[in-house]
């Protein structure tokens, strides 16, 4: 190569470039990093200097292979020293070749610089000696950097200066050896220079480890010698060489640029920096790594070489440090880019290491504090959380911290509370609950205001005791039937904070809900004792006692407003809790057994699955079935009302007060989102029912009837889905207009006002179902669907039948309810087959709902609805006309007729219905032929 360089520079350059490209490619294949072309390397190649440097580098690589073991072995022989140095050279060379990928620009630059310096030296001195010298010089540039860095690594790894001393000795010996071998002043000088640089690096690390001023002086002298030697030709070499060096070496490069003391000072400063980093090296591998990688440009293959050699030497010297160094080595490529910030990063790493150590110890408390802060941000739960945290910390600082950390993680991921330490978390939450009950947020206060203060206080006290007693508190909670509801209240309160605090508190709430579920299950026996009390009024009383459902009827009434206020505190919980409240109310309304309600409440949070909800609904169904039919209808009404109230914006709010509802809401949040489509259908159903309030006129009871039937029937899952969908919609942020807004968003046909009106009307209807037919009238009036109580009563008498009819409008639940009301549905499905009479298709909302539900039904048919005629597609005017002869439908038609007259002329809706006909036939049902005939009888819609 030297001959080529001297005789055929062009060919030499070409070969050099090819070799560089090949080496870069090999490095890339090796996977170090993506090689980048180094301008300096190219320039050096152009100069042809690289050739010898690389030849020497290859030789040094060979030496390095033998010396890498020697490096780890130590300072035993000048040969080893020389190998160490050559190993550094070879490491740099090798890494110039291999580490090119990671340090390619640096490696090649150093290679180029080393070769350039070496060949400059060669050009200045005999080429033959200069080859060795170039080798020492070139590798003195590269290998010295590499060796220094390697030695620095080794020394930093050793953090004891042993590798430093070894490398220093090796370097010193190698200086002698090099001098002897080269016999050239340049060789000697370059070797000492090279030694001085590795020595400087070693000295740097020695400074780091041993802080030997001797090393610094020696390295400085070597640096000076090198600087002097390379004053003209070595400057480039040292610049390239030292720039690859790190900050200290960069300083040397600067010193080289500013030869003399400055370079020494820079080297010493760099060494001092290295010393500091080495001091911290064992502690701060990242700092060392950063120091190792001074710059992308400063770093050179030697960095990788250092890493590798360092690993080998550390294997021999300090495996532990080797591991740390390896970690640092892993960091090197990254930190190499940060090399310029090495000093700052070193300090930053030191501070970070210290901070990390402190943070590790303080992390749990910080997490708790974060939660506390989040809770405090919640405002409502601020004092509660503070007190709860204080009490919980006082009583279980250690475990509270762990659960808090767990909860933070969980809260972030919103995993089940089960993920966190149940016992300690339960205790923590119990304490928080107890304090939450004591500090009862407005939700709890509302419930307390509802006359539950004594029990709330009692529950709060019991919860506090539980907090104090830990799991015993849980047992006590389970022992107290009201505690589970109360704890739910606490959870409700806490969910309020959760709503504000966000996922963390939600995780806490979820976890505590799981606890509540267990407690409620335990309370189940106690609640069973109160089953008999589950009479419709007593169920309400039980709710009041439980602090959960006392507000349900009230929720429908003024209690709902209070709960709304409480819920306002928990906006996040509004949607989730709203849906939960719907389900919860269903549960608790069906709560002939409070335990079942609690269980089901807990079940939903436990499983957070529609399955859970379905299961809970099934349990509710069982409870409903177990309870008297009157209670069942009442509970069903309330359930429906709760569900629909959840659908409506009020529902989520007043139900947000229900902690189990929060559980359900969270459980459903996951599913509710997935079941958004169902929710939309539910919305359609709700809106349809709202628009179809004729069917719903008495159908608060009808709703209760078919909802009960749904629950009793196989529709439990559907209802759960409906509730889930309602949840999803609430979660969607449709503030109770969820159904309407969802339908509106989905269809865009219904105006938000109409949707809201429908939702509110339906809510009113539901509330009226709970409160009486007068509410139905209100609903109908509000909807503009003027339905007389007689009609309502007629429909009430026909509830079962009309429920299917109404259910038919409901894509999910109403149809399912129809299916759920087997006898009624089957007996009346012919009449209800075409709910046109019940559905005021003339009302745009009804038509929108019909079209919407029909299209959705087509998109995803529900076999549960098969038994139910497709009211949504059925609504064409012919259907109402054809079916109005049916007596029930006649009465319904009478009811609708006023609505039609109020809203539109009877004839007007027909074209609109015809427009809706384009939707399709919908699901197969027994009345398909009738529907088809009715449609055929009608003129084609324009």
From Swiss-Prot:
Homodimer. It comes from the Eukaryota. This is Apolipoprotein B receptor. The gene is Apobr. Coiled coil: none annotated. Residues 66-212, 240-269, 283-487, 501-607, 671-942 are annotated as: Disordered. It comes from Mus musculus. There are 2 forms in macrophages, the membrane-binding proteins 200 kDa (MBP 200) and 235 kDa (MBP 235), that can be reduced into a single active ligand-binding species with intermediate mobility (MBP 200R). Keywords: Atherosclerosis, Cell membrane, Cholesterol metabolism, Chylomicron, LDL, Lipid metabolism, Lipid transport, Lipoprotein, Membrane, Phosphoprotein, Receptor, Steroid metabolism, Sterol metabolism, Transport, VLDL. It is a peripheral membrane protein. Its main location: membrane. The lineage of its organism: Eukaryota, Metazoa, Chordata, Craniata, Vertebrata. The modification Phosphoserine is found at residues 364, 484, 520. The keyword Protein biosynthesis does not apply. One of its GO terms (biological process) is triglyceride metabolic process. GO terms for molecular function: very-low-density lipoprotein particle receptor activity. Induction: Increased in high-fat diet ATM (adipose tissue macrophages). PANTHER family: APOLIPOPROTEIN B RECEPTOR, APOLIPOPROTEIN B48 RECEPTOR. Highly expressed in spleen, lung and skeletal muscle, and weakly in brain, heart, kidney, and testis. GO terms for cellular component: chylomicron; low-density lipoprotein particle; plasma membrane; very-low-density lipoprotein particle. Residues 837-853 have a biased composition (Low complexity). Residues 353-370, 415-425, 709-721 have a biased composition (Acidic residues). Macrophage receptor that binds to the apolipoprotein B48 (APOB) of dietary triglyceride (TG)-rich lipoproteins (TRL) or to a like domain of APOB in hypertriglyceridemic very low density lipoprotein (HTG-VLDL). Binds and internalizes TRL when out of the context of the macrophage. May provide essential lipids to reticuloendothelial cells. Could also be involved in foam cell formation with elevated TRL and remnant lipoprotein (RLP). Mediates the rapid high-affinity uptake of chylomicrons (CM), HTG-VLDL, and trypsinized (tryp) VLDL devoid of APOE in vitro in macrophages. Residues 854-863 have a biased composition (Basic residues). Residues 106-123, 132-143, 240-252, 312-330, 338-352, 384-397, 444-458, 466-475, 514-531, 672-687 have a biased composition (Basic and acidic residues).
């Amino acid at each position: 190569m030297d001959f080529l360089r001297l005789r055929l520079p062009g060919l030499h350059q070409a070969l050099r470039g090819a070799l560089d490209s090949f080496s870069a490619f090999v490095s890339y294949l090796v996977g170090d990093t993506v090689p980048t072309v180094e301008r300096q390397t190219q320039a050096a190649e152009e100069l042809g200097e690289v050739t010898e440097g690389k030849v020497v580098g290859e030789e040094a690589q060979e030496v390095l292979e033998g010396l890498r073991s020697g490096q780890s072995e130590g300072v035993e022989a000048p040969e080893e020293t020389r190998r160490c140095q050559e190993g550094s050279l070879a490491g740099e060379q090798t890494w110039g070749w291999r580490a090119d990928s990671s340090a390619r620009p640096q490696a090649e630059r150093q290679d180029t610089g080393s070769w350039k310096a070496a060949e400059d030296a060669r050009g200045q001195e005999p080429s033959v000696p200069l080859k060795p010298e170039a080798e020492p010089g070139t590798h003195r540039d590269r290998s010295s950097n590499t060796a220094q860095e390697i030695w620095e690594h080794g020394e930093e790894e050793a953090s004891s200066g042993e590798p430093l001393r070894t490398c220093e000795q090796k370097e010193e010996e190698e200086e002698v050896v090099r001098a002897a071998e080269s016999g050239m002043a340049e060789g000697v000088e370059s070797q000492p220079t090279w030694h001085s640089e590795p020595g400087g690096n070693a000295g740097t690390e020695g400074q780091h480890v041993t802080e030997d001023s001797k090393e610094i002086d020696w390295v400085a002298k070597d640096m000076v010698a090198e600087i002097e030697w390379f004053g003209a030709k070595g400057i480039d070499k040292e610049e390239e060489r030292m720039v690859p060096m790190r900050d200290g070496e960069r300083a040397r490069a600067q010193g080289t640029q500013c030869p003399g003391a400055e370079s020494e000072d820079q080297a010493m400063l760099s060494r001092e920096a290295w010393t500091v980093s080495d001091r911290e090296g064992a502690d701060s591998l990242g700092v060392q790594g950063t120091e190792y990688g001074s710059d992308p440009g400063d770093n050179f293959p030697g960095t990788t070489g250092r890493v590798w050699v360092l690993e080998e030497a550390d294997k021999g010297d300090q495996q532990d440090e080797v591991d740390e160094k390896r970690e640092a080595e892993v960091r090197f490529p990254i930190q190499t880019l940060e090399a310029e910030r090495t000093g700052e990063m070193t300090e930053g790493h030191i501070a970070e290491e210290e901070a990390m150590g402190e943070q590790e110890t303080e992390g749990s408390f910080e997490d708790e504090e974060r939660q506390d802060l989040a809770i405090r941000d919640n405002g409502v739960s601020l004092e509660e959380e503070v007190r709860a945290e204080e009490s919980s910390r006082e009583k279980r600082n250690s475990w509270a911290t762990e659960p808090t950390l767990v909860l933070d993680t969980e809260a972030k991921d919103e995993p089940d509370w089960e993920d966190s330490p149940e016992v300690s978390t339960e205790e923590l939450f119990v304490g928080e609950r107890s304090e939450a009950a004591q500090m009862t947020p407005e939700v709890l206060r509302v419930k307390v205001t509802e006359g539950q203060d004594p029990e709330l206080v009692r529950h709060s006290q019991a919860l506090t005791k539980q907090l104090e007693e830990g799991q015993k508190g849980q047992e006590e909670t389970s022992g107290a039937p009201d505690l589970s509801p109360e704890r739910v209240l606490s959870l409700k309160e806490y969910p309020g904070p959760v709503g504000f605090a966000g996922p963390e508190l939600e995780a806490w709430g979820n976890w505590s809900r799981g606890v509540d579920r267990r407690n409620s299950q335990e309370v189940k026996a106690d609640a069973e004792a109160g089953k008999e009390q589950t009479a419709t009024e007593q169920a309400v009383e039980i709710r009041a006692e439980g602090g959960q459902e006392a507000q349900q009827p009230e929720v429908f009434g003024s209690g709902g407003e209070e709960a709304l206020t409480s819920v306002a505190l928990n906006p996040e919980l509004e949607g989730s809790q709203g849906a939960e409240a719907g389900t919860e109310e269903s549960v608790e309304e069906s709560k002939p057994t409070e335990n079942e309600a609690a269980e089901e409440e807990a079940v939903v949070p436990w499983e957070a699955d529609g399955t859970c909800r379905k299961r809970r609904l099934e349990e509710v169904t069982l409870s409903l079935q177990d309870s008297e039919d009157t209670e069942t209808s009442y509970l069903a009404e309330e359930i429906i009302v709760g569900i629909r109230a959840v659908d409506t914006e009020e529902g989520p709010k007043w139900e947000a007060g229900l902690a189990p509802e929060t559980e359900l809401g969270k459980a459903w949040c996951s599913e509710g989102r997935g079941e958004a489509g169902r929710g939309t259908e539910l919305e359609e159903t709700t809106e349809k029912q709202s628009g179809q309030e004729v069917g719903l006129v008495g159908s608060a009871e009808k709703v209760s009837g078919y909802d009960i039937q749904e629950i009793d029937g196989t529709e439990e899952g559907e209802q759960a889905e409906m509730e889930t969908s309602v949840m999803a919609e609430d979660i969607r942020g449709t503030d109770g207009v969820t159904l309407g807004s969802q339908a509106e968003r989905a269809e865009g046909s219904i105006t938000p006002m109409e949707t809201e009106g429908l939702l509110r009307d339906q809510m009113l209807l539901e509330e009226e179902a709970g409160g009486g037919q007068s509410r139905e009238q209100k609903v109908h009036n509000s909807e503009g669907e003027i339905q007389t109580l007689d009609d309502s009563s007629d429909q009430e008498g026909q509830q079962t039948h009309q429920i299917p009819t109404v259910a038919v409008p409901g894509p999910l639940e109403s149809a399912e309810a129809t299916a759920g009301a087997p006898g009624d549905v089957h007996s009346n499905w012919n009449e209800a087959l075409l709910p046109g009479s019940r559905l005021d298709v003339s009302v745009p909302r009804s038509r929108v709902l019909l079209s919407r539900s029909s299209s959705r039904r087509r998109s995803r048919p529900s076999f549960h609805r098969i038994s139910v005629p497709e009211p949504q597609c059925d609504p064409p005017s012919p259907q109402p006309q054809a079916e109005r002869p049916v007596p029930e439908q006649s009465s319904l038609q009478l009811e609708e007729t006023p609505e039609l007259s109020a809203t539109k002329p009877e004839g007007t809706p027909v074209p609109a219905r015809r427009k809706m006909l384009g939707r399709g036939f919908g699901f197969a049902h027994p009345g398909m032929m009738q529907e088809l005939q009715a449609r055929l009888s009608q003129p084609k819609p324009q």
